[in-house]
From Swiss-Prot:
The gene is DIRAS2. Residues 197-199 form a propeptide. It comes from Homo sapiens. The keyword Cell membrane applies. It is found in: Cell membrane. Coiled coil: none annotated. This is GTP-binding protein Di-Ras2. GTP binds at residues 14-21, 33-39, 61-65, 121-124, 152-153. It comes from the Eukaryota.
Length: 199
């Protein structure tokens, strides 16, 4: 499927095994797989309506490996929004996001206007937690981005993650409708602009 100029591109970054693919597959297809299959790069698409026209939410699930720096740079340069995923059971996976965030800043410039979510996945594995949510929240404040904990396995906060990411978009109105209900924030944005809804 050729890329359209009005595609809304979201890139998902994080170390290998943190659950990037699991989050994306849970959101797009509603499925979860127990086995770990390393990703080189996959793209998933979801049709959304945006300001009364159709556009595509294009989600790029990037590799957790450091072997493909050119692909990583390309995903950043083409991306409109970013999801930075670590596992709450691995401090190392949080540390590995720092150079990725720095690269986003370097390529994109003013990151305050770009939707970025810091995501602590695997919150269903709390007994093995290495990263406290308060610590990740503090990092998100430093990075001026939003923060959320998720569980792809339990489908906890998965749709909400993508909704919140789209709510951060200030340049146009894009949103998911969760069970047909709109948040007050969405209603307020829709009064100000057109509206975007996942079909």
């Amino acid at each position: 499927m050729p890329e359209q100029s009005n595609d809304y591109r979201v890139a998902v970054f994080g170390a290998g095994g943190v659950g990037k693919s699991s989050l994306v597959l849970r959101f797009v297809k509603g499925t979860f797989r127990e086995s770990y299959i390393p990703t080189v790069e996959d793209t998933y698409r979801q049709v959304i309506s945006c300001d009364k026209s159709i556009c595509t939410l294009q989600i790029t699930d990037t590799t957790g490996s450091h072997q493909f720096p050119a692909m990583q740079r390309l995903s950043i340069s083409k991306g409109h929004a970013f999801i930075l995923v670590y596992s709450i059971t691995s401090r190392q996976s949080l540390e590995e996001l720092k150079p990725i965030y720095e690269q986003i800043c370097e390529i994109k410039g003013d990151v305050e206007s770009i939707p970025i979510m810091l995501v602590g996945n695997k919150c269903d594995e709390s007994p093995s937690r290495e990263v406290q949510s308060s610590e990740a929240e503090a990092l998100a404040r430093t990075w001026k981005c939003a923060f959320m904990e998720t569980s792809a396995k339990l489908n906890h906060n998965v749709k909400e993650l993508f909704q919140e990411l789209l709510n951060l978009e200030k340049r146009r109105t894009v949103s998911l409708q969760i069970d047909g209900k709109k948040s007050k924030q969405q209603k307020r944005k829709e009064k100000l602009k057109g509206k975007c809804v996942i079909m």
